[in-house]
């Protein structure tokens, strides 16, 4: 006797394609836990929909705790790259600078070439534009964070962000504005 039953193996939806107002906080948290394999809620998230010369959707998360291997040079970046909701690669280093390697999330670029290697990806104009826009939006998000939330962020990720002052000459002023140092006052 055979019994057939249906079981959903992958229940996650592509919530990054939805409008922000159609996604609840619980959906954001559940999706974060799915893609990051972290059981803690994220500190905050950034849901973007870019249109114009560079078109893409992005859903990025700042974890509430730094991963244990944050300073390991072999640490995987946490951004998954998609093209028209088709998975291209995980741990896409080209989308954010090294000092943002703790960021988790998804970027879906419909204009991306599907036959793309890592070497071609590094020189791709579309990927460079996406990277520039994501970095700008991440800095904006960090600048708008509430003081207590930013303190949590800085305590967890500050030392990693300080590396960017030396490695990213284009954004060193923005990183320096975010830097916090302990004083005796």
Residue ranges and their predicted role:
Residues 1-185:
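Conserved GHKL (Bergerat-fold) ATPase module
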């Amino acid at each position: 006797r055979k019994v057939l039953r249906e079981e959903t193996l992958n229940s996650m939806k592509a919530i990054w394609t939805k409008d922000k107002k159609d996604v609840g906080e619980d959906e954001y948290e559940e999706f974060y836990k799915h893609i990051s394999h972290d059981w803690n809620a994220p500190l905050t998230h950034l849901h973007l929909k870019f249109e114009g010369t560079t078109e893409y959707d992005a859903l990025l998360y700042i974890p509430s705790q730094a991963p244990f291997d944050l300073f390991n040079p072999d640490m995987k970046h946490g951004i998954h790259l998609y093209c028209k909701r088709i998975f291209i690669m995980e741990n896409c280093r080209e989308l954010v600078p090294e000092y943002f390697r703790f960021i988790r999330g998804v970027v879906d670029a419909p204009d991306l070439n599907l036959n793309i290697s890592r070497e071609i990806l590094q020189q791709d104009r579309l990927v460079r534009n996406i990277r520039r826009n994501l970095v700008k939006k991440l800095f904006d998000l960090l600048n708008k964070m509430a003081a207590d939330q930013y303190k949590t962020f800085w305590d967890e990720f500050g030392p990693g962000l300080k590396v960017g002052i030396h490695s990213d000459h284009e954004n060193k002023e923005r990183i320096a504005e975010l830097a916090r140092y302990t004083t005796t006052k």
